[in-house]
Amino acid sequence: MVKVGIFGATGYTGVELIRILSKHEKVEIKYLSSQSYNTKAISDVYSSLIGFCDKVLEEVDFQKAMSECDVIFTALPSGHASKIAREAVKKGVKVIDLGADFRFDDYSVYKEWYSGDYEDYGDIKRVYGIPEIYRDDIKEAQVVGNPGCYPTSVILGLMPLLKNGIIEGNIIVDSKSGVSGAGHNPSYNNMYAECNENIKAYNVAKHRHIPEMEQELSKIFGEKVSVVFTPHLAPMTRGILSTMYCKLKKDMDVNTVYNIYTDFYKNEYFVKVLKPGNYPATKNVYGSNFCHIGFEVDKHTNTLIVMSAIDNLVKGASGQAVQNMNIMFGIEENTALDIVPIYP
């Protein structure tokens, strides 16, 4: 059994980890930390977990967690995971960070976009955790930086096109996200009266996920990729729908595009390519680790329009983290993740 610890167990990504791991046949949850709810059972905080995980939440104790666990998931604000990872690596404990601490190749880019006085993690060997790209590296990894939710939807949506050199490197991305993407802590923008019957753009042209997208898309393309990104908050709990506008280098019909995608993702269980004329919807991936991809060719402007849908808390966060854990420990990749989406 793989012994697991979670720092930040009562945030949305933390409790989603527990939901998934509680049904994992090769995992034992050994340690859960929470600054807000320590000494309470997790099932007293989230009654959805009654009978599935009733473990008592503890104060943050790095040494205790490292002595009890084979892998630690960190679902903490930026800047905390690097301190934990440095000690964990020395003790042979693996770390999967759901924050942004280990997503960037260049620490200076991280520091520029994520304000704060963070510890330089440049000496910590880490792998960016998209299995569809870095599976072999993840197998050997000690530290994995779990991708952001928006970048996951965008990278999976664009990878076949960039890998095959079909599109130009200037891409426009429009994404809609459920409110859970903003986290568990209450804020003005997350209030019911602000979100209900309302959709609004935020952090236009300055969202923190932009450099993460550009870093990975540029590596796939082999040259610089520029992303114009506009995220929106949609009146739903879960889900991300990303629409990407790409200039084709030559004329191409939708059936040719479909064949490129199906060939590229033929061995990827969690990526589903929809037939021409069918478009992704967040409802069709709700509660699952799947990514649905669809597309259309606008012949009038020679633009390829790609759409991808994920559940931001599963494939966009905790599900992908468990997928990475499975790979790191040689467990079948879809263990505990073979979840049929909830519909309607």
UniProtKB/Swiss-Prot annotation:
Organism: Thermoanaerobacter pseudethanolicus (strain ATCC 33223 / 39E)
Protein name, UniProt field: N-acetyl-gamma-glutamyl-phosphate reductase
Reactions that this protein is recorded to catalyse: N-acetyl-L-glutamate 5-semialdehyde + phosphate + NADP(+) = N-acetyl-L-glutamyl 5-phosphate + NADPH + H(+)
Family (UniProt): Belongs to the NAGSA dehydrogenase family. Type 1 subfamily.
InterPro entries: AGPR_AS, AGPR_type-1, NAD(P)-bd_dom_sf, NAGSA_dehydrogenase, Semialdehyde_DH_NAD-bd
Source organism, top-level taxon: Bacteria
Annotated GO MF terms: N-acetyl-gamma-glutamyl-phosphate reductase activity; NAD binding; NADP+ binding
Cysteines paired by S-S bonds: none
Function text: Catalyzes the NADPH-dependent reduction of N-acetyl-5-glutamyl phosphate to yield N-acetyl-L-glutamate 5-semialdehyde.
